[in-house]
């Protein structure tokens, strides 16, 4: 059969590209080894050093478990900080104070020396749902589906792909050679290479199927209040609550407004209220201690006064009750003064709650409708007598997010200020990570100074595989922390938006650092761009030859092993948190302050960062599951241990988070990138080893191209929705009548006010019973109105989109 002119042209072009890259008919493996003769990364050690690395990592894991067991029982309840956290800091503690506290004692006392270890297996999803929230259930369900997927992938990789690779005879017959287990062991004319591409397609469909089953199992419960509340930006800063209510009554007479809350800058007031609360707890602690002992306690409140062993001038001791009483009075004065200033700091935003969801939906559609007039398209909502005064044409209207999802202190940062801050942070982050993307650059720098030369002759797997993979894991844990904290500094309006952007940034960064650049033999983004665009570089001709080096897969197998044992062990120990916790306990000036530190040490679980970390390792596993099938069972071990550690941490360590469903669906989309990268890896292998004209290369290329086209069509144009794994269920309230009755009932507290300020409002109401009947969500004559630091926490993208419009 005569080849078509198109294929001949394509082949000639492919040959020229391969020649430009310095690739011959067959890669020169010895050259790759010789080019790194002074390096500690690529060495032909026994079976890639995997047995030695596995033994060391398992030993380290057992040691970390032992250390954590000791610390958990001896050091300030470090292993159960969520259980001893402040009882009224989160709604779950209020809800479970009478039912779950005894259950916690059962876990601590009934199970022997390591109750936390067996508690991981005894915990039921109902307990986790009640204690940790539905987001934790969705997260753990996602992990379970990944576990079942990897069980199937491991079975197919070990029972089908591995024997096929071992049947080749291209590499050494040594049974201790790791390269015999990889795809590099097959001859270029072996028809079994087709099997790898077919199984890669099967893995793609398996991933879509498992993810679709996961999203179908999600029953997302929408809060009644959130579904009836709209968030409005673009209000004049001098707008009044009564004017906004009148506008909706006149423009939408069929829609009944239940409440309107204007937004104010209450960041400082929130801080003062938290400090006052800590002071009151310390005062109560020493008051109760005096009642119990009959003696007044002396403290040294000066900086580092707890280290003073004797009383000298400037380091005098004073009565604890008198000190905290004085601090409480001072904070109350500052709070009262700040309350007066709050009314002068409106944010131009408001929450509007309606009687029914249909009313809120109708108004939202009216504001977002696009009415085209000639060549100009603009939306004009229904007018009222206050439309001109309120500039309704400039409003941006969206559904409100859950009040627990709002980052209250960030609401005052909006518009141009928010964008400038975002650009500055991310530009600085990019510059910093441009040259320090991977730990490989550290190894290269060490090699330049001949640091590794004395141990080069040892050819020890501990040196050549354990330390590089441990270093890779260490940097993959450290450097994303920089991305994590940079996201916190961006001042997002919602925790959901913060977590989703954090997940995307950390995931992309980790994939480059852990998978793409090490696979290409590159050391940082600097070298990546030089290799990509600098055609005259002498380094460009040697990079791609080392992509599918026989022992290259061993490096990633060892990385997965390190993540499974050392990574999960360190995540259980949480060494940075332990260091911070220890430092805060040492620096606490009094016993009451140490009690406050213990009760305020727990933080919300960062689903964004945890999703990104787990999906990075999952992507590495899937990307090499065909070319290096040995990685699959170790990946399964990683996910199993990760699931156990996360169950423990969610229940005992972290506070619950209330996020939007978008964070969980974004994780599903990122999981689909793993089998697609596996197809890319097979295509690169076929292109480099077989050539573009090879049937297996053409078939793999067509599959990759078709997959990309389907993804683009679904993402950009909404096609192939039946193929999408995103198919979740929304639970409706049991009774609409109950919802209507609930809408007319006065809530126990103002929903769109920070919890700490809401408690202050309750105190004022208790002190002034005559005002209780007059209290409304947006009133500015009481604390809930003076501090309505309410600002809708939009969805991840919505909050960012609305922010610049407030400039």
UniProtKB/Swiss-Prot annotation:
Main location (coarse class): membrane
Ranges for region Gating helix: 555-586
Extracellular side: 1-51, 168-191, 445-462, 533-554, 625-628, 690-694
Keyword ATP-binding: no
Region (Intracellular linker IL2): 219-414
Residues recorded as bearing Phosphoserine in the entry: 739
Keyword Glycoprotein: yes
Keywords: Calcium, Cell membrane, Endosome, Glycoprotein, Ion channel, Ion transport, Lysosome, Membrane, Phosphoprotein, Transmembrane, Transmembrane helix, Transport
GO molecular function terms listed in the Swiss-Prot or TrEMBL record: calcium-activated cation channel activity; mechanosensitive monoatomic ion channel activity; nucleic acid binding; osmolarity-sensing monoatomic cation channel activity
GO CC terms: early endosome membrane; lysosomal membrane; plasma membrane
Cytoplasmic side: 75-134, 218-416, 491-495, 587-606, 652-661, 710-807
Family in the record: Belongs to the CSC1 (TC 1.A.17) family.
PANTHER family: CSC1-LIKE PROTEIN 1 (PTHR13018:SF24), PROBABLE MEMBRANE PROTEIN DUF221-RELATED (PTHR13018)
Function of the molecule: Mechanosensitive cation channel with low conductance and high activation threshold. In contrast to TMEM63B, does not show phospholipid scramblase activity. Acts as a regulator of lysosomal morphology by mediating lysosomal mechanosensitivity. Important for the baby's first breath and respiration throughout life. Upon lung inflation conducts cation currents in alveolar type 1 and 2 cells triggering lamellar body exocytosis and surfactant secretion into airspace. Also acts as an osmosensitive cation channel preferentially activated by hypotonic stress.
Subunit structure, interactors included: Monomer.
Name of the protein: Mechanosensitive cation channel TMEM63A
Organism the protein comes from: Pongo abelii
């Amino acid at each position: 059969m005569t080849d078509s002119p198109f294929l001949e042209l394509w082949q000639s072009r492919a040959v020229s590209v391969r020649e430009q890259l310095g690739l011959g008919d067959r890669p020169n493996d010895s050259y790759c080894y010789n080019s790194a003769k002074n390096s500690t990364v690529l060495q032909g050690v026994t079976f890639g050093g995997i047995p030695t690395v596995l033994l060391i990592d398992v030993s380290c894991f057992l040691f970390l478990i032992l250390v954590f067991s000791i610390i958990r029982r001896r050091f300030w309840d470090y292993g159960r900080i969520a259980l001893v956290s402040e009882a009224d800091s989160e709604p779950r503690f209020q809800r479970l104070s009478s039912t779950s506290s005894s259950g916690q004692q059962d876990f601590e006392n009934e199970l022997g020396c390591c109750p936390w270890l067996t508690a991981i297996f005894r915990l039921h999803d109902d307990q986790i749902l009640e204690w940790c929230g539905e987001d934790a259930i969705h997260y753990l369900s996602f992990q379970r589906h990944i576990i079942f997927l990897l069980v199937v992938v491991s079975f197919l990789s070990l029972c089908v792909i591995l024997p096929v690779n071992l049947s080749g005879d291209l590499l050494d017959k040594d049974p201790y050679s790791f390269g015999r287990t990889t795809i590099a062991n097959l001859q270029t004319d072996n028809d079994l290479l087709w099997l790898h591409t077919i199984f890669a397609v099967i893995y793609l469909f398996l991933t879509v199927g498992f993810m679709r089953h996961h999203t179908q199992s999600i029953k997302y419960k929408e809060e009644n209040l959130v579904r009836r509340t709209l968030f409005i930006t673009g209000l004049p800063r001098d707008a009044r609550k009564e004017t906004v209510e009148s506008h909706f009554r006149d423009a939408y007479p069929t829609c009944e407004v239940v409440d309107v809350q204007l937004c104010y800058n209450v960041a400082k007031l929130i801080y003062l209220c938290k400090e006052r609360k800590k002071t009151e707890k310390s005062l109560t602690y020493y008051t109760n201690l005096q009642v119990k002992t009959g003696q007044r306690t002396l403290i040294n409140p000066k900086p580092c006064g707890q280290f003073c062993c004797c009383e000298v001038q400037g380091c005098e001791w004073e009565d604890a009750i008198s000190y905290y009483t004085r601090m409480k009075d001072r904070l109350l004065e500052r709070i009262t003064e700040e309350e007066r200033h709050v009314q002068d700091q409106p944010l131009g935003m408001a929450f509007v709650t309606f009687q029914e969801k249909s009313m809120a939906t109708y108004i939202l559609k009216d504001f977002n409708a696009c009415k085209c007039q000639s060549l100009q398209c603009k939306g004009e909502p229904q007018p009222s007598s206050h439309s001109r005064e309120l500039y309704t044409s400039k409003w941006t209207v969206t559904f409100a997010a859950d009040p627990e999802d709002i980052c209250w202190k960030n609401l005052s940062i909006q518009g141009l200020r928010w964008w400038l801050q975002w650009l500055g942070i991310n530009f600085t982050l990019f510059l910093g990570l441009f040259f320090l993307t991977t730990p490989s650059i550290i190894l290269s720098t060490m090699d330049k100074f001949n640091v590794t030369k004395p141990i080069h002759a040892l050819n020890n797997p501990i040196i050549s595989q354990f330390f590089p993979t441990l270093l890779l894991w260490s940097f993959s844990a450290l450097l994303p922390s920089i991305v994590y904290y940079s996201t916190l500094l961006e001042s997002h309006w919602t925790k959901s938006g913060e977590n989703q952007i954090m997940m995307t940034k950390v995931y992309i960064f980790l994939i480059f650092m852990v998978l793409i650049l090490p696979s290409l033999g590159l050391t940082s983004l600097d070298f990546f761009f030089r290799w990509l665009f600098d055609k005259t570089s002498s380094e460009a001709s040697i990079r791609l030859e080392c992509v599918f080096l026989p022992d290259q897969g061993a490096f990633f197998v060892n990385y997965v092993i390190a993540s499974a044992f050392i990574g999960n062990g360190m995540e259980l120990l949480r060494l940075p948190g332990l260091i911070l916790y220890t430092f805060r306990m040492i620096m606490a000036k009094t016993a009451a302050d140490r009690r406050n530190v213990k009760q305020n040490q727990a933080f919300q679980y960062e689903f964004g960062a945890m999703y990104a970390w787990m999906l990075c390792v999952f992507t590495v596993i899937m990307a090499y599951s065909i070319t290096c099938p040995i990685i699959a069972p170790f990946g399964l071990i990683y996910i199993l241990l990760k699931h156990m550690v996360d169950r423990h941490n969610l229940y005992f360590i972290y506070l619950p988070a209330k996020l939007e469903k978008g964070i969980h669906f974004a994780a599903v989309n990122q999981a689909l990138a793993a089998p697609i990268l596996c197809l890319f890896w097979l295509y690169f292998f076929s292109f480099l080893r077989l050539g573009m004209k090879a049937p297996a290369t053409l078939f793999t290329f067509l599959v990759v191209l078709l997959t990309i086209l389907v993804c683009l069509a679904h993402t950009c144009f909404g096609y192939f929705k039946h193929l999408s794994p995103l198919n979740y269920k929304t639970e409706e309230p049991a009774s609409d009548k109950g919802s209507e009755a609930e809408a007319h009932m006065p809530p126990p507290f103002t929903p769109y006010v920070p919890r700490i300020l809401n408690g202050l409002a309750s105190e004022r109401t208790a002190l002034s019973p005559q005002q209780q009947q007059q209290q409304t969500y947006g009133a500015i004559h009481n604390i809930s109105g003076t501090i309505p630091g309410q600002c809708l926490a939009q969805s991840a993208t919505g909050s960012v989109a609305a922010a610049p419009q407030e400039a």
